Swiss-Prot record:
Database matches in SUPFAM superfamilies: CNF1/YfiH-like putative cysteine hydrolases
Species lineage: Archaea, Methanobacteriati, Methanobacteriota, Stenosarchaea group, Methanomicrobia
Protein name from the UniProt record: Probable chemoreceptor glutamine deamidase CheD
Family annotation (CDD domains): CheD
Coiled coil: none
Organism: Methanospirillum hungatei JF-1 (strain ATCC 27890 / DSM 864 / NBRC 100397 / JF-1)
Claim: Hydrolase is one of the keywords in the record: yes
Amino acid sequence: MSETITGSDQREVIIIGIGEWSTGDTVMTSIGLGSCIGLVIHDETRKIGGLAHVMLPKSSGKPNERAGKYADTAVEVLIKELTQKGSKVSNLKAKLAGGASMFQNFSGNLNIGERNAEALKAILKELSIPIVREDLGGTIGRTVTYYPKENGRLVIRQADGTTREI
């Protein structure tokens, strides 16, 4: 399950591990996104949203307590929880970060990062949830921090020290 810590600026921060998710208005972070993708679904009107650490493109269709692990179930659980908190699907927007190609020197590269990105884009398009910003691909891992109360700001810190905001 996700863990809550107090950040250096004394704000509560929820740490989202692989296959985990959280929704609400608290700052959320996901550390060590390689081929995994940090999926943010944000409701700017209500200043709430969710972050999921998506590892694989598709679930087997079986119920799973780690719904955040798969693109299809992560989108579903974030939308479900946000609408239960009063969001309208028509107000939701998405941001994606991660999907790196971490093992490019191996033959038969599975392109998991690319497949994760394609799956999330297709699902969000089908649900008419626009992707307003993305930072995908490359060969360097990322850590993302999502600030729901700050217009859905998403800060991305790459393993090489580069930081940017989307």
